Every structure is written in C-alpha cells, then in structure tokens.
Amino acid sequence: MLEFEFLQIAVGNRDKFLCCPSDEEWRRLFYFAQKQSLVGFLFCGIERLPNEQLPKRDLLLKWYGMAESIKKVNVIKNVRCAELDAILRKGNFKGCVLKGQGTALLYPYPEYRQSGDIDMWIGTSDGRLVSIDTVISYAKQRGVQVSHVDIKHADMRFFNDTQVEIHFKPSYSYNFV
C-alpha cells in the first residue's frame, strides 16, 4: 500500500518509492495525509524524495504551505504550554502536558506534529489529585472562561489563540465489572 511506503520514507526507513506515484496517487496521498493529520509529518517524506518522485509543483507548494503553517502553530502551542505551566504553578498546581504537544517530542520531527488543543493534567505541587471545584475556582479567579466540564476534564479559555483542556483525573474507567 502506497501510504505505508510513504510513512516508511517519512521516518527514514526508505529513501524513495518503489514506483513513482502518479498525479492521482499523489492527490490520494495528500488526502490521506489530511485525513490522518499527517500533512506535516509526511512532508518530511517529500523532503527526502529524489526530484523525479516529487509531486507536481502546485501540490508540492500547497503541501509545503500547510507544513509551514503547522510549524508556526506548534511554536505558538509550545509557548502556550510553558505559559500555562507558569500560570498553574502560581496556583500551587503542578502540570503535565498530555497527548498532542506532550507526545510530539517523541516524533522525529516534532515541529510537524499536528495536534488540536493543549491537554494538561494537573495535580497539587506535592503530587495529590485536585478536585474539579478547586480547578474551576482557580480558573475563574483568573478570569478564565470555563466550558464543557465532565468527570475527567474541563475546557478552559486561558488564551485566545489556543484551546486548553485541563484534566484533573489521570484516568477514568467507563466500564464497571
């Protein structure tokens, strides 16, 4: 399958495709990249390809533009993670970045990792769990808009340009035996 071959190129396990993709195959690869949130990551594969295997110029430029946008968004999100951590420390909370931004550093090219919001689990500075009421009270004291609260997390508007989910339970089982 061409998609898996492309993933191998992106991670450095291959240098090129066995057969050069057609224009239609490149369009399908681009659609796959968009659908799987791999536009930036697979752009790294494009950068590794020999010139004769590159997609047509219009698709290449579109892909490049989207990859550069992802990099810019990640710069902002990384700054926001540090700012959020500082805000929470002022309230004697200790945070841990989860999921997207938290796992991006495990990628060969973290700047190209597409993620949604910032997910941060918080506890007390001495490692204890915090209640939802404590988290919401602290956020509201800082003028933070709080929406969608459930049993494990709450959406909080710390920043205008970045969505944040604060997790106050590290896990929750929906299945009870």
Regions found by a protein language model. Name each.
Residues M1-G116, I122-V177:
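Conserved NTP-donor binding/palm subdomain of two-metal-ion nucleotidyltransferases/polymerases, i.e.
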